[in-house]
Amino acid sequence: MALPDIAETRKLSDTEINEQISGTRRELFDLRFQQATSRLENPHRFRHARVKLAQLLTVQQERERSAAPAN
């Protein structure tokens, strides 16, 4: 499974980005819980979820900065 592509993330609407952020945070929480209880089958999913979350937050931040008036 390849890492997520930021170009796909940039195509999402603001609402979809917010939904994906909360979903990815929940996924990371679940992965940590599985790791703590020794039920984690795919440890590489940590990296994918972290990269996806970073990309989502980056795009969200870019949009907030472009919408804010420049001083």
Curated annotation (Swiss-Prot):
Highest taxon in the source lineage: Bacteria
Signal peptide location: none
An individual GO BP term: translation
GO cellular component, one term: cytosolic large ribosomal subunit
Keywords on record: Ribonucleoprotein, Ribosomal protein
Pfam families: Ribosomal_L29
CDD domains xref list: Ribosomal_L29_HIP
Record GO terms (molecular function): structural constituent of ribosome
Keyword check for Ligase: no
Family designation: Belongs to the universal ribosomal protein uL29 family.
Name listed for the protein in its UniProt record: Large ribosomal subunit protein uL29
Organism, scientific name: Synechococcus sp. (strain RCC307)
Taxonomic lineage from the root: Bacteria, Bacillati, Cyanobacteriota, Cyanophyceae, Synechococcales
Originating gene: rpmC
